[in-house]
From Swiss-Prot:
Lineage, highest ranks first: Bacteria, Bacillati, Actinomycetota, Actinomycetes, Kitasatosporales
InterPro entries: Cyt_P450_B, Cyt_P450_sf, P450-rel_GT_act
Domain of life: Bacteria
Family to which the UniProt record says this protein belongs: Belongs to the cytochrome P450 family.
Biased composition range(s): Basic and acidic residues: 139-149
SUPFAM superfamilies for the chain: Cytochrome P450
Role summary: Involved in the biosynthesis of the macrolide antibiotic tylosin derived from the polyketide lactone tylactone. TylM3 is required for the glycosylation of the 5-hydroxyl group of tylactone to yield 5-O-mycaminosytylactone.
Coiled coil: none
Pathway: Antibiotic biosynthesis; tylosin biosynthesis
GO biological process terms, semicolon-separated: antibiotic biosynthetic process; cholesterol catabolic process
Protein name: Protein TylM3
Lyase found in the keyword field: no
Keywords in alphabetical order: Antibiotic biosynthesis
Length: 423
């Protein structure tokens, strides 16, 4: 049984996938079959299948089961090798034999997961080349003021009424869209369209490994096309070589929802540790340490998908070209913490600020984030710093709601907080 984790694929941007043929009925059936295959694998005791089921429960127990089975776990039913080992994760990241696309430009799982992935392919089509064709975007000096996540965060929070319950998910998404739009040179008058389209692409990373509902997949395709249209109207798009707009779209999509998830995860971790939140409000400069700890303990991208571009040896196993591999980033980070000694036992902003600790796996080193990783971190830090400065009495105002079918991001649908403690 071969699902999204399997090695089959078609050339990125090709015309053989159901999405290109607009055969939505066939695509919907294929998504249902892939979903059924992942559920069947879970029923047979496959922990990777349980992770891909992606309900609202914490996937950490299944991640740990995979890690405990050795450096490489073979999900036979899903045709994928999976690792929770930090050593193996770092080896995969450093080895050019592994990429997001095969050597001939095929994306693994395109047959099993139609209507997904095309908005991200352009970021990976030339692993050895520049992140974006023509060097876009290189920020000109006169854009310094617009490309300022601290200012964008402050402006958004100024619109929040005093004492009102604030849902951090739309705040984080709007902050991500504004900062990403400025980074890509989207004119102010087009930012509302850009924000709407970018938010509509929020399931793109999850859809690489987990079949989405057909209605959501179709909505995502429409949003991706709307985003391409907006970016094609920017001054930076003029005179750029073919593919530049698609590459810019890929980097926007790969950055935006991870920014929102990272910021929301950081707030959740701190709300669960009031003393650490108080330390942050006393010294907002700790926002960087808090984001690093969040990247370590609650990363915004938990599953990193790779395919062997050529025959490779990993953890003593020979993996033929076309082999699909998934890195469990959160498990790999916990593995690094175990090896760091007894001092690193959990989320601790003050320890990070004073003594450091293991560096999180992913982001700048990950294929999705070689260009956008610094933007993801910088924007999340700005949002967290602004919240600490503006709302030092921030507290939970209801349960957080996790999104289903979100094994990659473990995204949030709602995160209500109260800015002020009632007198």
């Amino acid at each position: 049984m071969n699902t999204a984790a399997g090695p089959t694929g078609t050339a990125a941007g090709g015309t053989t996938a159901p999405a290109a043929a607009h055969d939505l009925s066939r695509a919907g059936r294929r998504l249902q079959l892939t979903r059924a295959a992942q559920w069947f694998a879970g029923n047979q005791g496959d922990p990777y299948g349980m992770i891909l089921r992606a309900g609202t429960a914490d996937p950490a127990p299944y991640e740990e089961e995979i890690r405990e089975r050795g450096p490489l776990f073979h999900s036979e039913l899903l045709g994928t090798w999976v690792t929770g080992s930090r050593h193996v994760a770092d080896a995969v990241t450093a080895d050019d034999a592994f990429g997001a696309l095969t050597a001939d430009g095929a994306r693994p799982g395109v047959r099993e997961l139609p209507l997904s992935g095309s908005a991200l392919d352009a970021a990976h089509g030339n692993p050895g080349g520049p992140p974006l064709p023509g060097g876009w975007p290189h920020r000109p000096p006169d854009r310094e003021e617009r490309d300022d996540p601290d200012r964008h965060a402050a402006d958004l929070l100024n619109a929040a009424g005093p004492g009102q319950v604030l849902d951090l998910v739309p705040f984080a998404r709007r902050l991500a869209a504004r900062t990403t739009g400025a980074w890509l040179g989207v004119p102010a008058e087009r930012l509302p369209r850009f924000e709407t389209a970018l938010t509509g692409c929020r399931r793109a990373l999850d859809a690489l490994l987990c079949p989405q509902l057909l209605a959501d997949a179709r909505a995502g395709l429409a949003a991706e096309e709307a985003l391409r249209a907006v970016l094609g109207e920017t001054p930076e798009a003029r005179g750029r070589p073919p593919g530049a707009v698609e590459a810019a779209r890929a980097h926007a999509v790969s950055a935006a929802e991870p920014i929102a998830v990272l910021l929301c995860n950081a707030v959740r971790e701190l709300m669960e540790r009031p003393a650490q939140w108080r330390a942050l409000t006393a010294d907002p400069g700790l926002a960087g340490a808090a984001i690093t700890e969040t990247l370590l303990w609650a990363p915004p991208v938990r599953l990193e998908s790779r395919v062997a571009r050529e025959t490779a040896v990993l953890a003593g196993r020979t993996l033929p070209a076309g082999t699909h591999l998934v890195v469990l980033a959160a498990a790999a980070n916990r593995d690094a913490c175990r090896n760091a000694g007894p001092a690193v036992t959990g989320f601790d902003v003050l320890r990070r600020a004073s003594d450091g600790g293991p560096q999180p796996h992913g982001l700048p080193e990950d294929l999705h984030f070689r260009l956008s990783g610094p933007l993801v971190r910088r924007t999340a830090e700005a949002g967290l710093r602004a919240l600490a400065e503006r709302f030092p009495g921030l507290r939970p105002a209801g349960p957080a709601v996790r999104v289903r079918r979100s094994p990659v991001l473990r995204g949030l649908g709602r995160l209500p907080v109260a800015p002020y403690v009632p007198e």
